[in-house]
Amino acid sequence: MSEALKSLNNIRTLRAQGRELPLEILEELLEKLSVVVEERRQEESSKEAELKARLEKIESLRQLMLEDGIDPEELLSSFSAKSGAPKKVREPRPAKYKYTDVNGETKTWTGQGRTPKALAEQLEAGKKLDDFLI
């Protein structure tokens, strides 16, 4: 909450500020705040009415489905069965290149993704990628 709102929410601060302001300005502030509160109440009631209308529509559709012999749970399960299919996991590719890194360890690379740093350095030194084929 901002400092201005904190001070508006504190009764002692409001009383102290109210003593310093003329009555006309205080009444004007009261009118404006009342308008804001009323607008907010109307927004909340309209949202509540929309939600109520939506729930009534859902219930009427559910009743129509039951009258036609369609179980809503059955309908939902048919959708979830299709979308919940497990994703196929791709098998790892076999290594295509073999190289020795800076520490002297022999490593492999499939040829996909970024070229390993040790292999890239050797390629820059003049070796060919075909030299590292397994």
UniProtKB/Swiss-Prot annotation:
The protein's name: DNA-binding protein H-NS, plasmid
GO cellular component: cytosol; nucleoid; protein-DNA complex
Disordered: annotated span: 77-96
Annotated GO MF terms: bent DNA binding; DNA-binding transcription repressor activity; minor groove of adenine-thymine-rich DNA binding; protein dimerization activity; structural constituent of chromatin; transcription cis-regulatory region binding
Further comment: This protein is encoded on incompatibility group H (IncHI) plasmid R27, a temperature-sensitive conjugative plasmid.
UniProt KW keywords: Coiled coil, Cytoplasm, DNA-binding, Plasmid, Repressor, Transcription, Transcription regulation
Key word Glycoprotein present: no
Localization per Swiss-Prot or TrEMBL: Cytoplasm, Nucleoid
DNA-binding region: 112-117
Coiled coil regions in record: 23-67
Functional summary from the UniProt entry: A DNA-binding protein implicated in transcriptional repression and chromosome organization and compaction. Binds DNA, modifying gene expression, especially non-core genes. Does not regulate the same set of genes as its chromosomal counterpart (tested in S.typhimurium strain SL1344 / SV5015, chromosomal H-NS protein is AC A0A0H3NBY9). Thus it has a not-completely overlapping set of gene targets compared to its chromosomal homolog; many of these target genes are either plasmid-encoded or acquired by horizontally transferred genes (HTG).
Main location group: cytoplasm
Superkingdom, natural source: Bacteria
Family the entry assigns: Belongs to the histone-like protein H-NS family.
Gene this protein is translated from: hns
Subunit structure comment from the entry: Homodimer that oligomerizes on DNA into higher-order complexes that form bridges between disparate regions of DNA compacting it. Interacts with Hha, YdgT and StpA.
Organism field: Salmonella typhi
